[in-house]
From Swiss-Prot:
It comes from Listeria innocua serovar 6a (strain ATCC BAA-680 / CLIP 11262). Residues 36-68 form a coiled coil. The gene is gpsB. Forms polymers through the coiled coil domains. Interacts with PBP1, MreC and EzrA. It is found in: Cytoplasm. InterPro entries: Cell_cycle_GpsB, DivIVA_domain, DivIVA_fam. Gene3D superfamilies: 6.10.250.660. One of its GO terms (cellular component) is cytoplasm. The lineage of its organism: Bacteria, Bacillati, Bacillota, Bacilli, Bacillales. Its main location: cytoplasm. This is Cell cycle protein GpsB. It comes from the Bacteria. One of its GO terms (biological process) is regulation of cell shape. Divisome component that associates with the complex late in its assembly, after the Z-ring is formed, and is dependent on DivIC and PBP2B for its recruitment to the divisome. Together with EzrA, is a key component of the system that regulates PBP1 localization during cell cycle progression. Its main role could be the removal of PBP1 from the cell pole after pole maturation is completed. Also contributes to the recruitment of PBP1 to the division complex. Not essential for septum formation.
Amino acid sequence: MTSEQFEYHLTGKEILEKEFKTGLRGYNPEDVDEFLDMVIKDYSTFTQEIEALQAENIRLVQELDNAPVRTTTQPAPTFQAAAQPAGTTNFDILKRLSNLEKHVFGNKLDDNE
């Protein structure tokens, strides 16, 4: 985004130089001045932040334009090796399960058969 895409209605200087009319009850000029001072500081900070972000955006776009196109042609990793630890097969798992059942249930399994 460029600064041309934003329409600014006020500048810090315009805020500083703004004159307010007083009404019947008026206002406290010191309160207005203090408030406007805060607005001016914030406005200046926002302007600096916008300029910094625009500069960073331009830099990143240029960096992206200059970066080589990367294609990922690596094969997808296989999870088969991670699923079974070394030396463990389905037979080993079934054998361990059988031993565990015998230990937990004891002879109750043999009586039910």
